[in-house]
């Protein structure tokens, strides 16, 4: 199910993913969000009334609106405009090294990485910046790396209907670097293949070779 914003009178409030919310009567507004940040500051042992923290609840609420803005955007809108006059081009289109940040859905700490996305056109191509925007849409949500990899591939396959899609994500998880085992510098790699990329080993090899060159 697509994510949509639950409307209220506060235009700075955060969007809500309806797919993950089964019951909701009234979405919290900006004052409630700021109060929640203030509560967390108190819980952490801080004084939210000291000079350096007076504006922090407001700043955090505003930052979260941007950091999780992907809930209010749709890949269908981004990929809806395509080009058919491509002089018969039907080979791989690859956009690699797309930098992104996301947030772990388990601890709400950053995931920092890059995505490599390729597809095999079936008569239609999309502007290259649109591929990066799709990555951004799914990244600016609470995520697992496995989910974001699959979501990018699924949306491109479903909307553009190419002969195949390949997605690789390499990322460092701050939940591993900053807490628990505290292993800085470790990276996680995930891949998803559809269509010809999944069924034909030579297409996978081409994709993997190109992203490493």
Swiss-Prot record:
InterPro entries: GTP-CH-I_C/QueF (IPR043133), GTP-CH-I_N (IPR043134), GTP_CycHdrlase_I (IPR001474), GTP_CycHdrlase_I_CS (IPR018234), GTP_CycHdrlase_I_dom (IPR020602). Pfam families: GTP_cyclohydroI. Pathway: Cofactor biosynthesis; 7,8-dihydroneopterin triphosphate biosynthesis; 7,8-dihydroneopterin triphosphate from GTP: step 1/1. It catalyses: GTP + H2O = 7,8-dihydroneopterin 3'-triphosphate + formate + H(+). Keywords: GTP-binding, Hydrolase, Metal-binding, Nucleotide-binding, One-carbon metabolism, Zinc. GO terms for molecular function: GTP binding; GTP cyclohydrolase I activity; zinc ion binding. It is an enzyme of class 3 (hydrolase). The keyword Metal-binding applies. GO terms for cellular component: cytoplasm. GO terms for biological process: one-carbon metabolic process; tetrahydrobiopterin biosynthetic process; tetrahydrofolate biosynthetic process. Disulfide bonds: none annotated. The keyword Zinc applies. Signal peptide: none annotated. Zn(2+) binds at residues 104, 107, 175. Its EC number is 3.5.4.16. Homomer. NCBIfam families: folE, PRK09347.1-2, PRK09347.1-3. PANTHER family: GTP CYCLOHYDROLASE 1 (PTHR11109:SF7), GTP CYCLOHYDROLASE I (PTHR11109). Belongs to the GTP cyclohydrolase I family. HAMAP family: FolE (MF_00223). This is GTP cyclohydrolase 1. The lineage of its organism: Bacteria, Pseudomonadati, Pseudomonadota, Alphaproteobacteria, Hyphomicrobiales.
């Amino acid at each position: 199910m697509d994510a949509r914003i639950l409307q209220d009178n506060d235009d700075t409030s955060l969007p809500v993913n309806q797919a993950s919310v089964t019951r909701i009567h009234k979405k919290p507004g900006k004052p409630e969000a700021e109060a929640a940040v203030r509560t967390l500051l108190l819980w952490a042992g801080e004084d939210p009334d000291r000079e350096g923290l007076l504006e922090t609840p407001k700043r955090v609420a505003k930052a979260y609106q941007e950091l999780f803005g992907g809930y209010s955007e749709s890949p269908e809108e981004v990929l809806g405009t395509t080009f058919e006059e491509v002089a018969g081009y039907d080979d791989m289109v690859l956009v690699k090294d797309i930098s992104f940040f996301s947030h772990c859905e388990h601890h709400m700490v950053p995931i920092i990485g890059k995505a490599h996305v390729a597809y095999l056109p079936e008569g239609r191509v999309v502007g290259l910046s649109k591929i990066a925007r799709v990555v951004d849409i799914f990244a600016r949500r609470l995520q697992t790396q496995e989910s974001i990899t699959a979501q990018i591939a699924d949306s491109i396959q479903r909307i553009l209907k190419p002969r195949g899609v390949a997605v690789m994500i390499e990322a460092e998880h701050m939940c591993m670097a900053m807490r628990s085992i505290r292993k800085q510098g470790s990276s996680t790699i995930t891949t998803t293949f559809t269509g010809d990329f999944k069924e034909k080993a030579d297409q996978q090899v081409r994709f993997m070779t190109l992203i490493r060159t």
